[in-house]
């Protein structure tokens, strides 16, 4: 592998696990992070020698852990999901919450925004998936064909021509949904443990899922078939496709594994030297991942409250 990922910087600002990270295609100089400290931070990526990123705004209002966050594609707004059962929409110019999405009866575990910035999907421990408009009106609650356990992850296809989203749950299922009719297209079974992460490739053709069983499963969204599986051999906390390489990155415990989808092999494993972690205490884990829009920088969120920034180098 001629290209490698090298640890470039760490971002300090949260006082709890960094549960989620998001970037926006139209603004490469910002990063959004959500945390168990109940806050969301908007980072300005200055990339100088002193600071790689500066905390520009801290968004507060949730009364429990922030479990997921998403930037709108135009980067004007942000969404956050929380264990306080709500989703919030934030105006990033003003730094204030403009709408609360109320309707879930248990912790909201995941949130995603459509490529046209107009629709929002959420998944919850109440076992439902809800589709909302951007100002917080619930348009539809999916129960028919839905999950029989916690809905851990929901993600829109980033391809605006592909009106689908996917969901994953603790019922070991991965489900593909039609956004126009809110109907179930396919249920994918194969995982032997709960599924905690699901993601769609940039062109909308592939879906990857992972979780407790340590297996990455690749699904063809056009043909509704299982393509192949990759063994991570560790609990998978988060997944993300590279925007410009045939790479799939998996947060697996205290490391990040990079798989090449052409060779179907692991090509890199990113690890951190944790100083002062005793033999009895476990190492911090990576639990969130996102790429910069140009695919040159991988951001990772950890349970030691840090964001670690990795750069692709030749």
From Swiss-Prot:
Q: Name one GO cellular component term.
A: ribonucleoprotein complex
The WD repeat ranges on this chain: 13-44, 61-91, 103-133, 146-178, 190-220, 231-260, 281-311
Q: Which residues carry this modification: Phosphoserine?
A: 39, 148, 242, 255
State where it is primarily located: cytoplasm
Phosphothreonine PTM sites in chain numbering: 10
Which UniProt keyword terms apply here? Cytoplasm, Membrane, Phosphoprotein, Repeat, Ribonucleoprotein, Ribosomal protein, WD repeat
One GO biological-process annotation of the entry reads: negative regulation of translational frameshifting
- Phosphotyrosine: residues carrying this PTM: 52
Q: Which SUPFAM superfamilies does this one have?
A: WD40 repeat-like (SSF50978)
UniProt cross-references to PROSITE patterns, sorted A to Z: WD_REPEATS_1 (PS00678), WD_REPEATS_2 (PS50082), WD_REPEATS_REGION (PS50294)
Q: Which residues form a coiled coil?
A: none
GO molecular function (one) = translation activator activity
What is its subcellular localisation?
Answer: Cytoplasm; Membrane
Xref: CDD domains: WD40
User: Which proteins does it associate with, and in what oligomeric form?
Assistant: Component of the small ribosomal subunit (SSU). Mature yeast ribosomes consist of a small (40S) and a large (60S) subunit. The 40S small subunit contains 1 molecule of ribosomal RNA (18S rRNA) and at least 33 different proteins. The large 60S subunit contains 3 rRNA molecules (25S, 5.8S and 5S rRNA) and at least 46 different proteins. RACK1 is located at the head of the SSU in the vicinity of the mRNA exit channel. RACK1 interacts with the mRNA-binding protein SCP16. RACK1 also exists simultaneously as a homodimer in a cytosolic non-ribosome-bound form. Interacts with pck2.
Give the protein's biological function: Component of the ribosome, a large ribonucleoprotein complex responsible for the synthesis of proteins in the cell. The small ribosomal subunit (SSU) binds messenger RNAs (mRNAs) and translates the encoded message by selecting cognate aminoacyl-transfer RNA (tRNA) molecules. The large subunit (LSU) contains the ribosomal catalytic site termed the peptidyl transferase center (PTC), which catalyzes the formation of peptide bonds, thereby polymerizing the amino acids delivered by tRNAs into a polypeptide chain.
Q: What family, per the record?
A: Belongs to the WD repeat G protein beta family. Ribosomal protein RACK1 subfamily.
Q: What is this protein called?
A: Small ribosomal subunit protein RACK1
| Species assigned in the record | Schizosaccharomyces pombe (strain 972 / ATCC 24843) (Fission yeast)
Q: What is the lineage of its organism?
A: Eukaryota, Fungi, Dikarya, Ascomycota, Taphrinomycotina
């Amino acid at each position: 592998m001629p290209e490698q990922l090298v640890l470039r910087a760490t971002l300090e600002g949260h006082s709890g696990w960094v549960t989620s990270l998001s970037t926006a295609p139209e603004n490469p100089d910002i990063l959004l992070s959500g945390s168990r400290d109940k806050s969301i931070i908007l980072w300005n990526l200055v990339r100088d020698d002193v600071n790689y990123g500066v905390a520009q705004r801290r968004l507060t209002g949730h009364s429990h852990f922030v479990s997921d966050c998403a930037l709108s594609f135009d980067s004007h707004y942000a969404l956050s999901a929380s264990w306080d059962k709500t989703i919030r929409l934030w105006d990033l110019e003003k730094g204030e919450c403009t709408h609360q999405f109320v309707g879930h009866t248990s912790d909201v575990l995941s949130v995603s925004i459509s490529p046209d910035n107009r629709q929002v999907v959420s998944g919850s421990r109440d076992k439902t998936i809800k589709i909302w408009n951007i100002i917080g009106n619930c348009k539809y609650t999916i129960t028919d064909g839905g999950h029989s356990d916690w809905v851990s992850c929901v993600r829109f296809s980033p391809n605006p021509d592909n009106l689908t989203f996917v969901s994953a749950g603790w019922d070991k299922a991965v489900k593909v949904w039609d956004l126009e009719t809110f109907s179930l297209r396919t249920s994918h079974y194969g995982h032997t443990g709960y599924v905690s992460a699901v993601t769609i490739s940039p062109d909308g053709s592939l879906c990857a899922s992972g979780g407790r069983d340590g297996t990455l499963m690749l699904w063809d969204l056009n043909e509704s078939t299982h393509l192949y599986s990759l063994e991570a051999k560790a609990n998978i906390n988060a997944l993300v496709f590279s925007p410009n390489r045939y790479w799939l990155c998996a947060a697996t415990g205290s490391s990040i594994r990079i798989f090449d989808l052409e060779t179907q092999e692991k090509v890199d494993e990113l690890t951190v030297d944790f100083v002062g972690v005793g033999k009895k205490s476990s190492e911090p884990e990576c639990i969130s991942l996102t790429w910069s829009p140009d695919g040159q920088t991988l951001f990772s969120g950890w349970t030691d409250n840090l964001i670690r920034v990795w750069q692709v180098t030749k």
